[in-house]
Amino acid sequence: MRNCKMARVASVLGLVMLSVALLNLSLISYVSLKKENIFATPKYASPGAPRMYMFHAGYRSQFALKFLDPSFVPITNSLTQELQEKPSKWTFNRTAFLHQRQEILQHVDVIKNFSLTKNSVRIGQLMHYDYSSHKYVFSISNNFRSLLPDVSPIMNKHYNICAVVGNSGILTGSQCGQEIDKSDFVFRCNFAPTEAFQRDVGRKTNLTTFNPSILEKYYNNLLTIQDRNNFFLSLKKLDGAILWIPAFFFHTSATVTRTLVDFFVEHRGQLKVQLAWPGNIMQHVNRYWKNKHLSPKRLSTGILMYTLASAICEEIHLYGFWPFGFDPNTREDLPYHYYDKKGTKFTTKWQESHQLPAEFQLLYRMHGEGLTKLTLSHCA
C-alpha cells in the first residue's frame, strides 16, 4: 500500500515537473499559435494566411499575459514581414474619413467640449468627475474661472495634415522627427519631453495633454523653488501651444488642480501657453468608441487625441502607437515610452485600465481603410 502511494506521489511530481519544463520551453522558444482572424482584412482572413508566431523571446512575459488578459492581441508574423518588406503606398480615403468625422460629431461636440469657457461655468458651480463616484465634486473658484478661455481655443480652426504623437518606444531610433514637424498641427500626449529626442519625435508642439498627476510625479507638487522653476521653464518651451488639462477625470486630481491654478494665477502674463480645461467630455467620447467595440475602463490619451483631431484636421497621421515590447521591424526589445531610461523594463500596468492591443487593432484596421496613416516603420 505504501509503495502504491509513493508511486502515485512520484507520478504526480513527474507530471508537475513535465508541465513546468514544457512551459519554460514554450516561453523561451518560438511559439506557434493557431491562425486567428486578428486583422479584419482579406489578406489575414484568407484560408492560406500564414500561421502566427509570438516570435520574440524577450517578449515571453507578454505572451504569458495573453492567457490572463483576453484583450491581449498577439501580433502576426505576417504583419512583421509586411513591415520589413517595402510597404505598399498608403492612400487617404477622404470619403471614409469624412464619414467617420460625422459619426464622431454625432456623439461629441468636440469644439464645445474641448474646454470649459468663462461663459460655460459660474463661480461656485460644482463639477463632477468622469471616472469617480458622483459624490466627489470640485467647486469652481474665481481664480479657476479666470484661467478659462473666452471661447474654445479650436473655434474656427482647421488644419490640413495633423500628427498625433503617442509615446511608444517604437519611436526610438525612428528618425521621424522631420516628418512630424512638417505637419500643420502636432498633438502630443502627457507633456512628453522632446528636447533630447528631436531626431525621432520632432520638436513642434501645438497641443500637449497634461494629466495633473504629472505635477506630482515629475515636479514634486511644486513644493520647492527649484520645482517651480523647473515647471516654469518646461512650460516656457511650449511657446504658445495649448496645454490641455483633464482636471475632471478623477477626484484624486483635485488638490493638484488647485496647486496648478495657484501657479498659473501667480505667473499670469509670464507664459504664452494657452490653457484648456475640458469638462466632462469622456461620456461622449466613450459612447462613440463603444460603438466600435472599444470599451475599456479608460480610453488611452492617444485615441482621445485622435477624436479631438478629427474635428479640426483634414488628414491625421499617427506616430508612436505601438503597445508591445518589441520592435516589429528589428525584433529588438523596446521600452514602453521612448523617453524611458535605458534598461527600463517594458511595463504592463496599463492593463489595469486600458485595452491598448485592442485599440491598436482598431487603429491598424483604420489605417488599412485609409482613414488615418499609422506609422510603424522608420521614417528615414
Curated annotation (Swiss-Prot):
Glycosylation-annotated residues: 93, 113, 206
GO CC, any one term: Golgi membrane
UniProt binding sites for CMP-N-acetyl-beta-neuraminate: 167, 190, 300-302, 322, 336-337
Cysteine disulfide partners in this protein: 162-313, 176-379
Ranges facing Lumenal side: 34-380
Localization annotation: Golgi apparatus membrane
Claim: Transferase is one of the keywords in the record: yes
InterPro entries, sorted: Glyco_trans_29 (IPR001675), Glycosyltr_29_Sialyltrsf (IPR050943), GT29-like_sf (IPR038578), Sialyl_trans (IPR012163)
Reaction equations catalysed: [N-acetyl-alpha-D-neuraminosyl-(2->8)](n) + CMP-N-acetyl-beta-neuraminate = [N-acetyl-alpha-D-neuraminosyl-(2->8)](n+1) + CMP + H(+); alpha-Neu5Ac-(2->3)-beta-D-Gal-(1->4)-6S-D-GlcNAc + CMP-N-acetyl-beta-neuraminate = alpha-Neu5Ac-(2->8)-alpha-Neu5Ac-(2->3)-beta-D-Gal-(1->4)-6S-D-GlcNAc + CMP + H(+); a ganglioside GM3 (d18:1(4E)) + CMP-N-acetyl-beta-neuraminate = a ganglioside GD3 (d18:1(4E)) + CMP + H(+); a ganglioside GM3 + CMP-N-acetyl-beta-neuraminate = a ganglioside GD3 + CMP + H(+)
Transmembrane stretches, start-end: 10-33
EC number: 2.4.3.-, 2.4.3.8
Pathway where it operates: Protein modification; protein glycosylation
Name of a matching Pfam family: Glyco_transf_29
Active site per database record: 354
Enzyme class of the recorded protein, top EC level: transferase
UniProt similarity note: Belongs to the glycosyltransferase 29 family.
Subunit relationships: Homodimer.
The protein's name in its UniProt record: Alpha-N-acetylneuraminate alpha-2,8-sialyltransferase ST8SIA3
Organism: Pan troglodytes
